[in-house]
Every structure is written in C-alpha cells, then in structure tokens.
C-alpha cells in the first residue's frame, strides 16, 4: 500500500494525547491478560489436568531509561502454549536509514511511539493463532496504525467459509463500519491480505483481518479523537471475538497428525516475522527490547 501524504504539524495538546494513548494501551493490556487468563481457567478438555497459566510481567528500559521502555507480559499455559501481550512507550532519534522511510523524520529525526502488541500460540491445533497490534507514532507528524489477523493452523480450517474466519471478519467489519468516517473496511481488509503474504511461498499467512497505517484523519471527519476511538475499538473487538473463537475450539480433541500440521504451519509464521514483518524490523533497528520483539515466535516449530 502506497504511503499517503500526512500533513505536517502537531496539535497543541499533543502531550495530553500521547498520555491518553499510552494509558489506553496499558489498560487494554490488562484487559487482554485478564481475558486470556480467564480462558486458561475455563478449559475442561485436553490438557485440563495441567495448572492454568498466568502471565509473568517483566519491565524493560530502552537506553537505560533515557529512551522510554515497556512491559513484556508472557504466559505459558494449558490453553496457550505461548502468548505475549506487550506494551511500550519509547522515544529517541531515527537512524539515517529510517529517516527516509518514516513520515516527518527527514525534517527532524526525533520520534515518540506507544503501542500494544499481542501474539497468541495456542496448544490445541484447532485454535487459531492470532496477532493484534495498535500504536500511535509522533514525529513532526502524527498518526495511528495497527490491525488484527487470524492464522488457522490446520489446512481444513484455512477457509473463508470456516466459522472462525466468518466470526473474525464480522467483528473487524463491525468495528470499521462503526467508525466509517475514518475506517474503510474493504481497504483495510485488502491491506491485511497484501501485507500478511509470504512471497517466497506464494501463500497468505492466515485468513486475514484488517491492517491500517498512517491514519491521520482531517478534522471534518473527527480528527485525532475519531482515529483514537477507532483504534480503541479495534482492541475491544479483538478481545471479544478471539475469546469466542478460543471457547468454541479449545476443548476439541486433536491427533498427532494435527500437531504435526500445526508445527509446520508455525514455521511459516516464523518465516514471515523474520523476513517481512515491519514491526519486527522497526523494533530491532530502533533499540527495542529484543526478547519482547522476538517473543512473537512460537515456542516449538518444525520444517519438513
């Protein structure tokens, strides 16, 4: 997707807006962690004899605290083999390489960014892997970005007609249509399909969702407040629909063949994240927390 022109300049109360965004991402983190721990408690099928998982939170600092930091939340449980829910608020200067790629950074390399990232790798092959992130970025310009996408592990579930895919797309469509002044569902859906694609495999990573970036709407459409409200609702919709999908599937029995297929599909996930994912590259090249960034990788993987 071609990068749009983002008008220069920041609102007078940009510091208040930064604080509101940071506070929301941390509130959403707590909501998601509580929801996923609740699913750990609810399990009654395979692996229910194991203890339910709980998140372990690890604060980290960038540049010894001079560049901000974040909190890495990781859980290894009986529903989720590995799940990370991470928040960060960082600031600093872009490298010369990045200045040419980031809107507003060529005029002034200083930046501020806050966001949340979620990646869940379930134990049960019938439960799809999911990813969600939302963020606010400030240079000499300001914008929001983010999205959510679903990756079924079993080929027989990798269909747009599968009930999980239908539910996920319905939730993402609903949130976009609720904020139609700033969110274009078809555009964001197509952007997701275009972004989460493995060219070397000539296949999509999953069944899609939505993806958006460089969102800065004009005042007549609601401006910052409308963009922020949409970004908040993306997070809320994600929590709602993923809980529903997990509950529908997590008590289903699986076979060794299902597990084998899951591990091979996870390999595709690793390939995408290390070769193509902009967030991974951005984090590693701006002094982010390496463990947090690479926690998106699944704990066990196979390549045939």
From Swiss-Prot:
UniProt site positions, description: Important for dimerization: 200
Cofactor(s) named in the record: a divalent metal cation
E.C. number: 1.3.3.3
KW Oxidoreductase (keyword) present: yes
Gene Ontology molecular function, alphabetical: coproporphyrinogen oxidase activity; metal ion binding; protein homodimerization activity
Pfam families linked: Coprogen_oxidas
Catalytic activities: coproporphyrinogen III + O2 + 2 H(+) = protoporphyrinogen IX + 2 CO2 + 2 H2O
Protein localization: Cytoplasm
InterPro entries, per the entry: Coprogen_oxidase_aer, Coprogen_oxidase_aer_sf, Coprogen_oxidase_CS
Top enzyme category: oxidoreductase
GO cellular component, one term: cytoplasm
Active site: 131
S-S bonds: none
Gene3D superfamilies on file: Coproporphyrinogen III oxidase, aerobic
Pathway: Porphyrin-containing compound metabolism; protoporphyrin-IX biosynthesis; protoporphyrinogen-IX from coproporphyrinogen-III (O2 route): step 1/1
Binding site for substrate: 117, 133-135, 287-289
Record flagged with keyword Transmembrane helix: no
Binding-site positions, a divalent metal cation: 121, 131, 169, 200
Region (Important for dimerization), start-end ranges: 269-304
Main location per the UniProt record: cytoplasm
Keyword terms of this UniProt record: Cytoplasm, Heme biosynthesis, Metal-binding, Oxidoreductase, Porphyrin biosynthesis
Family named by the database record: Belongs to the aerobic coproporphyrinogen-III oxidase family.
Role noted for this protein: Involved in the heme biosynthesis. Catalyzes the aerobic oxidative decarboxylation of propionate groups of rings A and B of coproporphyrinogen-III to yield the vinyl groups in protoporphyrinogen-IX.
Quaternary structure (record): Homodimer.
Protein name: Oxygen-dependent coproporphyrinogen-III oxidase
Annotated source species: Chelativorans sp. (strain BNC1)
Lineage, broadest ranks: Bacteria, Pseudomonadati, Pseudomonadota, Alphaproteobacteria, Hyphomicrobiales
Gene that produces this protein: hemF
